[in-house]
C-alpha cells in the first residue's frame, strides 16, 4: 500500500497541471526529492486531453459532482499532534460548471452501439433544453489507460532515433494512431431525428448542389473511432518564439512532444470567413486587399516591429484604446479589423495602444520560425505538454501517484510552516516545501478569492469553416463581439492530421471570458459558423457551412491573477499554482512556474539543459518497489540510465 512511499521529500506537489508539472521537472532536475501526486485518475488536471469516451466519462463525473478522490477510511484527525494544526483540502473539484452536451449526428440503430438518456430535440441551437438524467452508454469496455501505469511514465507514441530533432514540427497527415482512455462509461445527450428519411433528403439536396457530397457520419462512427479523438479541456496554441517553446527546447522536454504548424489565420467580417495575410508574401498575394491597402498594411507592420524606437508616433495615444489609435493611422476599416482581431488579437475596448503595439510586434516576431504563422499545436493535444514535463521529472527521480488523495496539510503552530501532508491512507509524508493547485484548496482558504470564469465549447464538425483545395488545415479565428464591451470569441479548428479527431471530421474549440453560462456566451457564434446536422431544410447559404455533429459546453474556473494574499491562513512554505487562464498562449503558466521556483530555490537554475550522458554518475539502483496488492495508487519512478543515454543538445537537430 502507500506505506511503500518514502516519508521524507524535499518537495511535495499536488496537482498535475502545466505549472505544477513544469515545477516538478525543475525541482527534480535541480536534485530535489519530488513527490508529485494527483487525486484524479488522469494527468493534467484541467490541462488534460481525452479520447471521446474519456471525455464523456469526465463529463459524467462532473455532472454527478463526484469527489475528486476516494473517500478515506482513516480518521486523520487522530494523526495531528498537540503542537500542530491541520488545514483541510477540498473534497470535490468545483472548477467545472454548466456542462451541456448535444449530439446532432444521426443515430444508426443497426450499429452495435446503444445510447441511453437522449435529450430532447434542439433543431435551432437556440431553444433551451431540459437536461435529463445522465445514464451509462453501452460502449465497448476499455481495458487500458493511456496515462502513466504502475511501472512507467507515458512514452512517446513513436520511438525517436538519436538523429531526430528536439522540437519536431510536422505537416504530414495522420500516420500514427494514439489511444487514450478514461474509464468505460459515457454520458451523452442526443438530438435525434424524428424522421428516418432526413439524412436521405439531405443527401438529395446536396447531390443537386455544386458542393461536393459529404460523407454521412453517425454517432456510432464517432464512438467507434473515439480513440482517434484527443480533446483538450483548455484550448491553447504555442507562440513559436514564446516562453513555452523556449523552455521545451532548453530543458529537452521537446523530445517527448511533436508539433504541427497552424496553417491559417482567419477573420470573420460582415458574416463571412476569410483568410488573413500574415507574411510579406501573403500580403502581396492577397486578393482581399487592394494595392493601396497592401502598402498601408506593410508600412504599419514594419512600424510595429520597431515601434519602441519611434515613441513620438504613439506617445500622445498611450491612454487611448488600440482601436482608436488604428483609426489615427488612417488604416481602412478592413485593415483595422485584420490588425485588431487577427494579428494583435486584442479586445476592441479594453486594449491600450501600448498593449496592442506590443501584441502586434510579438505576432510578427514569431512569424517564419517554423511556418507562415506564429503558432504551433502539439500533436495529440495540449495534454501532451504537462505529461512531457512529468516524464522529465521522473527521469531525474521524481515519484508519481495518481488517484492519491491528500486529506490535509499539517502545520506547526509555533513556526507557522507546513511540516507534512496526510494522505487518504493515513500516511504522513514530510517535506520542506509544498506546491498545490488552486482547486485543491478548501472553501475556507479561498473565501476571499474572486474567481473569473472561462466559457468553453467543443464541437465535432464534418468540414472546415473555410474550405480550400487542401483539407488538412489548422486554423485560428477571432469572432468580434456582437455588442460593444462584450468579449471576442476565439475559435481554433483542428484537422485530423493533428491527431485530435477522426478522418473526415474537424475538432473545433471555442473560448471566451465568461459573462453568462458557456452555452449562452458561445451559442450565437456556433449558429453563425455552423449548421446542425439534423436540420430538415438546407438552403444554399447553409450548404457552405460545416455541419455540427456533436457539441459540449462548459464553464471552467480561471484562477490566474489571484494574489497570494487573497488566500486565508496559507503557510509560508505552501505555494499555489493557478489553473488555465483565458489567454491564447501558455505564457502565464511558464512565468508562474519560474517565479515560484526562484522563490523556493533562488540559487538554482530553472530547468537547465540536461547533462551530457557521459557526465552522469549513478549512485546505484534506487527504484521504488511497486505497491503490492493495490489498484488505486499509481506510482512511477523512472531510472535515469536508459533515458539519459539518448539525451542530446536541444538545438542540435532543430529545423526551422
Swiss-Prot record:
Residues 188-209, 609-656 are annotated as: Disordered. It is found in: Cytoplasm, Cytosol. It holds the Pfam family RAE1_2_domI_C. SUPFAM superfamilies: FAD-linked reductases, C-terminal domain, FAD/NAD(P)-binding domain. Keywords: Cytoplasm, GTPase activation, Phosphoprotein. The modification Phosphoserine is found at residue 649. GO terms for molecular function: GDP-dissociation inhibitor activity; GTPase activator activity; small GTPase binding. It comes from the Eukaryota. Its main location: cytoplasm. One of its GO terms (biological process) is intracellular protein transport. Residues 639-656 have a biased composition (Basic and acidic residues). GO terms for cellular component: cytosol; nucleoplasm; nucleus; Rab-protein geranylgeranyltransferase complex. The keyword Phosphoprotein applies. Substrate-binding subunit (component A) of the Rab geranylgeranyltransferase (GGTase) complex. Binds unprenylated Rab proteins and presents the substrate peptide to the catalytic component B. The component A is thought to be regenerated by transferring its prenylated Rab back to the donor membrane. Less effective than CHM in supporting prenylation of Rab3 family. Substitutes for REP-1 thereby preventing widespread tissue abnormalities in patients with choroideremia who lack REP-1. Monomer. Heterotrimer composed of RABGGTA, RABGGTB and CHML; within this trimer, RABGGTA and RABGGTB form the catalytic component B, while CHML (component A) mediates Rab protein binding. Interacts with RAB1A, RAB7A and RAB27A, but has much lower affinity for RAB1A, RAB7A and RAB27A than CHM. Interacts with the non-phosphorylated forms of RAB3A, RAB3B, RAB3C, RAB3D, RAB5B, RAB5C, RAB8A, RAB8B, RAB10, RAB12, RAB35, and RAB43. PANTHER family: RAB GDP-DISSOCIATION INHIBITOR, RAB PROTEINS GERANYLGERANYLTRANSFERASE COMPONENT A 2. Belongs to the Rab GDI family. This is Rab proteins geranylgeranyltransferase component A 2. It comes from Homo sapiens (Human). The lineage of its organism: Eukaryota, Metazoa, Chordata, Craniata, Vertebrata.
Amino acid at each position: 500500500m502507500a506505506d511503500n512511499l518514502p516519508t521524507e521529500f524535499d518537495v511535495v506537489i499536488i496537482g498535475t497541471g502545466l505549472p505544477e508539472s513544469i515545477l516538478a521537472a525543475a525541482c527534480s532536475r535541480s536534485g530535489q526529492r519530488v513527490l508529485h501526486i494527483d487525486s484524479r485518475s488522469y494527468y493534467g488536471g484541467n490541462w488534460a486531453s481525452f479520447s471521446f469516451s474519456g471525455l464523456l466519462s469526465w463529463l459524467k463525473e462532473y455532472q454527478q459532482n463526484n469527489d475528486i478522490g476516494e473517500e478515506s477510511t482513516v480518521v486523520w484527525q487522530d494523526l495531528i499532534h498537540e503542537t500542530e494544526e491541520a488545514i483541510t483540502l477540498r473534497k470535490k473539484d468545483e472548477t467545472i460548471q454548466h456542462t451541456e452536451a448535444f449530439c446532432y449526428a444521426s443515430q444508426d440503430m443497426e450499429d452495435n452501439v446503444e445510447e441511453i438518456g437522449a435529450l430532447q430535440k434542439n433543431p435551432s441551437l437556440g431553444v433551451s433544453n431540459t437536461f435529463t438524467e445522465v445514464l451509462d452508454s453501452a460502449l465497448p469496455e476499455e481495458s487500458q489507460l493511456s496515462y502513466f501505469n504502475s511501472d512507467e511514465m507515458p512514452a512517446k507514441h513513436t520511438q525517436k532515433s538519436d538523429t531526430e530533432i528536439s522540437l519536431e514540427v510536422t505537416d504530414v497527415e495522420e500516420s500514427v494512431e494514439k489511444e487514450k482512455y478514461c474509464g468505460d462509461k459515457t454520458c451523452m445527450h442526443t438530438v435525434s431525428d424524428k424522421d428516418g428519411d432526413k439524412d436521405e433528403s439531405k443527401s438529395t439536396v446536396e447531390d443537386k448542389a455544386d458542393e461536393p457530397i459529404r460523407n454521412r457520419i453517425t454517432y456510432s462512427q464517432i464512438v467507434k473511432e473515439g480513440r482517434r479523438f484527443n480533446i483538450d479541456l483548455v484550448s491553447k496554441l504555442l507562440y513559436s518564439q514564446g516562453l513555452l517553446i523556449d523552455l521545451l527546447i532548453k530543458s529537452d522536454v521537446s523530445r517527448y512532444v511533436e508539433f504541427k504548424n497552424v496553417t491559417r489565420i482567419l477573420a470573420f467580417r460582415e458574416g463571412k470567413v476569410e483568410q488573413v495575410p500574415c507574411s510579406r508574401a501573403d500580403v502581396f498575394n492577397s486578393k482581399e486587399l487592394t494595392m493601396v491597402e497592401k502598402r498601408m498594411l506593410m508600412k504599419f507592420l514594419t512600424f510595429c516591429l520597431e515601434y519602441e524606437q519611434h515613441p513620438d508616433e504613439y506617445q500622445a495615444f498611450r491612454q487611448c484604446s488600440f482601436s482608436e489609435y488604428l483609426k489615427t493611422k488612417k488604416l481602412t476599416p478592413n485593415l483595422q479589423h485584420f490588425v485588431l482581431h487577427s494579428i494583435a488579437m486584442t479586445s476592441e475596448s479594453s486594449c491600450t495602444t501600448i498593449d496592442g503595439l506590443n501584441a502586434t510586434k510579438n505576432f510578427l516576431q514569431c512569424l517564419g520560425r517554423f511556418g507562415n504563422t506564429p503558432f504551433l499545436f502539439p500533436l495529440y493535444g495540449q495534454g501532451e505538454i504537462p505529461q512531457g514535463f512529468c516524464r522529465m521529472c521522473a527521469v531525474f527521480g521524481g515519484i508519481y501517484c495518481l488517484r492519491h488523495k491528500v486529506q490535509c496539510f499539517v502545520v506547526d503552530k509555533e513556526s507557522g510552516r507546513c511540516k507534512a501532508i496526510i494522505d487518504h491512507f493515513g500516511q504522513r509524508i514530510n517535506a520542506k516545501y509544498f506546491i498545490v493547485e488552486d482547486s485543491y484548496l478548501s472553501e475556507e482558504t479561498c473565501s476571499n478569492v474572486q474567481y473569473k470564469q472561462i466559457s468553453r465549447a467543443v464541437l465535432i464538425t464534418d468540414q472546415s469553416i473555410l474550405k480550400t483545395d487542401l483539407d488538412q488545415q489548422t486554423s485560428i479565428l477571432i469572432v468580434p463581439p456582437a455588442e460593444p464591451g462584450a468579449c471576442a470569441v476565439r475559435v481554433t479548428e483542428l484537422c485530423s492530421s493533428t491527431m485530435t479527431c477522426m478522418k473526415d471530421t474537424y475538432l473545433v474549440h471555442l473560448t471566451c471570458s465568461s459573462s453568462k453560462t458557456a452555452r449562452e456566451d458561445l451559442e450565437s457564434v456556433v449558429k453563425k459558423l455552423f449548421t446542425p446536422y439534423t436540420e430538415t431544410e438546407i438552403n444554399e447559404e447553409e450548404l457552405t457551412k460545416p455541419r455540427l455533429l456533436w457539441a459540449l459546453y462548459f464553464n471552467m474556473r480561471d484562477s490566474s491573477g489571484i494574489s497570494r494574499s487573497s488566500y486565508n491562513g496559507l503557510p509560508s512554505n505552501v505555494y499555489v499554482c493557478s489553473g488555465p487562464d483565458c489567454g491564447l498562449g501558455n505564457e502565464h503558466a511558464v512565468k508562474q512556474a519560474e517565479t515560484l521556483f526562484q522563490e523556493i530555490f533562488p540559487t538554482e537554475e530553472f530547468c537547465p539543459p540536461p547533462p551530457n550522458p557521459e557526465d552522469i554518475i549513478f549512485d546505484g539502483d534506487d527504484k521504488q518497489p511497486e505497491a503490492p496488492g493495490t489498484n488505486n495508487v499509481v506510482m512511477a519512478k523512472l531510472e535515469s540510465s536508459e533515458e539519459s543515454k539518448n539525451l542530446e543538445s536541444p538545438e542540435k537537430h532543430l529545423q526551422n
